[in-house]
């Protein structure tokens, strides 16, 4: 995550007006014959019972995630660097080994930067690309470029190696359930899961509309011009995005995630409810009722991040970014030593339950 606070936290009136006119889902509304692009507005989660919640908590492993997913990403990985290539290969290899048979696409392009043209590569991993609708989880895998200082490099642990590792751990822990999405049935919506790892979120110099969000700007434009389902004349891949859940700045202790957008408030409410439910069952560790992670206390400033190019095109967004930012943000101390395992483990459980509920698994 890049830029200083002023350019990233912007006046939100125009964005809130945009999301306010997007269709709001109303519980209990009868769908009838609803166009498939509108089904997301009436989609309801399939809540997990206590036994299933316990299975999720038992099935995720912070130790395995830490060793196999996170540590290989704790390297310098700004766009075009050797570390960027290594991180990209690591992410793809971790996904390719899974049973669920993800379809991987690498979206590589050149873009002008303050330092000339640079190559960027987004990673898009999709379960059942033929499904009309997808729940999308996303993060950025690049790290901000800083000159080496006293032989130290910036590895961006919270920004955003941990979100990448959380998504990889979700794919591993839920592999068996996600494998079943290949078998479309009348009892389940035509809905699947997509993981996006953006390149070039960070600014090379100073945050600006031109020097930031390279990968997400490119991919949003590309998806808007790609027919979906294949051969469609009036719908594109953005129509197929039910909800974009963007993870950023995660891994520091005691995070707070506010709700930014009214049109996705009911899905933020599910995160709140899942957190409360898991705590009541004793499935969250060292979790205080005075420090809830998810707090719906109104709609504050919109933070510039990879969701913006999609939000402007009408995609519903949940922005899971800790606010205020971690104290280590954009410092050399954003490293493994300052991560909080318990917090990450708890958030893994909440996110995995959310995905299972959304996908009716």
From Swiss-Prot:
InterPro entries: M28_QC, Peptidase_M28, QC/QCL. One of its GO terms (molecular function) is glutaminyl-peptide cyclotransferase activity. Keywords: Acyltransferase, Disulfide bond, Glycoprotein, Metal-binding, Secreted, Signal, Transferase, Zinc. Its EC number is 2.3.2.5. The keyword Transferase applies. It is an enzyme of class 2 (transferase). It is found in: Secreted. Its main location: secreted. One of its GO terms (cellular component) is extracellular region. The active site is at 201 (proton acceptor), 248 (proton acceptor). GO terms for biological process: peptidyl-pyroglutamic acid biosynthetic process, using glutaminyl-peptide cyclotransferase. Residues 1-28 form the signal peptide. Zn(2+) binds at residues 159, 202, 330. Responsible for the biosynthesis of pyroglutamyl peptides. Has a bias against acidic and tryptophan residues adjacent to the N-terminal glutaminyl residue and a lack of importance of chain length after the second residue. Also catalyzes N-terminal pyroglutamate formation. Belongs to the glutaminyl-peptide cyclotransferase family. This is Glutaminyl-peptide cyclotransferase. It comes from Bos taurus (Bovine). The lineage of its organism: Eukaryota, Metazoa, Chordata, Craniata, Vertebrata.
